[in-house]
Amino acid sequence: MLKSTPTGNVGEPDTEFQVRVLEASDPETSTSSSDSEHQTFVGHADASTKSSVEKLSEPKLTHAPPTKVLFLDGVRGLAAILVVAQHSKEYLQGFNLGAVAVDAFFVLSSFLLTWLFMKKSMKLLAQEAGIRSWIFALVDYFSKRFFRVYPLFAITAIGISFMSAEAQRRYFLFLNPGDFDLYQVLTFEFNHRQFVLWTLPLEISYYFVIPVFVLAILGMRRFWWVAVVPLTVWVVHQGVYEYRTSHTPLEPHIPTFLAGSLAAVVFVKLDVWIKSTGFKFRWWHTLMLRTVEGLTIAVLLSVCFKGLFFDWVEPNPVPTAKGFPFVSALLTTIFVIEMIRPSCVSTMFEWNVLRYWGKISFSVYLLHSFVIWNPTISAQPKYFNRLFARIFLLLLLATTSYYLVEYPSQLLGQRISRFLATRETKGSGSLVKFACMERITMRKKELQ
C-alpha cells in the first residue's frame, strides 16, 4: 500500500486529509485529476441536501489515501537552490551542481506528466471513450502545460526587451545589444536561447512526445516491458557515453526526459499490481529496497561531488567526460522506490522550506540573476551580508512573481480544465453548469 502523509489529528475525516495533501502540492504535481476534484466537491454539495436519515443509512465508504508525492516538491526546491548556487560563482563551486539540478527538473517534469497522462489514458481506455473524449483530454493536457510555464516566460522575455544593453549583458549574458530579438525568443528560435531560457523549449518539445509514448506503452498491454527494458538500457548507455551540455537541442537530452517517463511507467504498473494483488511488504522486501536505494544514493552523491565513495570504496567505472554528469537513472530509481515504499528520505524532502522553494522554483529559475548578479549586493564586503541579502531578496522576488503571474495562470488553466470536463460530459448544456459550478466554488472560498 502506498504511504500517505499524516495530518496530525486522527479524528479528521478522510476527505479533509485528501484536500490538504492536494492543496499543499503544486497543481501540476498532484496525483489527482480534475475529475476527482469535481467528484469530491460535488459530493460535499450533494451531502448537504440529504436528510439525516439518509446519511445514517448510508454505509461509510473507505477511500484509499492519496499517493505520497509531496517530497517531489522538495526535490524541485533543492534543484532550484542548486541552480542559484551554481550561477552565484561563490557557493558550491567546482561540482557542476547546476547541471545536476537541470537534469532533476527534466526528470521531474517527464516523470510527473507521464504519470498523470498515463492515469488519465488508462481511465479513458477502461471507459472505452470515443475520439471526442480523447480530443478533450489532449486539449486539457496541453492547455495546462501552456498556462503553467509560458506566461511567466513571456513576461520575462518582454521585460528583458525593455532593459538597457548593459543590463541585458549583466543579467542574461547577452554579448551584443543586437543579440536579443523578442519575437525569436518567444518562438524559441535556437540562436535566441540565452542564459536560462534554453531549457524551456526543450521541455515544451518533450510535452508533445509524452502522449505518443504513453499511448504506445498502453497499446502493448501486458507486454509493456518489451519496450521498457531495451529503452532503459539505451538510456543508461547514452547517459554514460554521450556528451550533453547546456544550450543544445533536445536530441542529446532525450535520454534524460525518457528516464523520467520510463520510471513513471514502472511505478504505475507496480502500483496497479500491488493494489490488484493485495501485495504486502515483508521485512526482507523492505530491506532489499533500502539496500538498493542506499547504494543508489551513495552513487548519486559520489557523481555529484566527484569523489566520496569513488575515493573510499571503488573508483568510478564510468569514463570521465566533459558535460553534464549522468544522474537521471539514479534519480528515477530513488523516486520509484520512495513512491512505492516511502522512507525518511521522502520525509526529509517534505520539509516545508524545501517545498516552498519548489512551489516558487520556476520564478526562482527565471529571475534569480536579477538578485545574485546585482552589483550593489555583490559589492558587499561581508560574506553573510551577501548570503542573507540574496536569500531574502530572491524569496521576495520569486514569491511576488509566483502570486502575480504563476498562480493566476494556473488558476486560469484549472478553470479551462473544468470547463473542458463539463463540456465533455454534458454537451450543449455544459456552459450553464460550468458557470454555476464556478459560482459555487467562489462561494465556498469566501466561506473558508
Pin down the residues of each PLM region.
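Alpha-helical transmembrane segments and terminal signal-anchor/GPI-anchor hydrophobic tails
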Residues: 251-353
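Generic helix-packing signal
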Residues: 264, 362-365
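Hydrophobic alpha-helical transmembrane segments in multi-pass integral membrane proteins
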Residues: 301-307, 365-378
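Transmembrane alpha-helix segments characteristic
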Residues: 228-232, 332-334, 367
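Short, locally clustered residues in the helix-turn-helix/winged-helix DNA-binding domain
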Residues: 118, 340, 371
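Membrane-cytosol interface segments of multi-pass membrane proteins
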Residues: 1-242, 249, 253-256, 272, ...
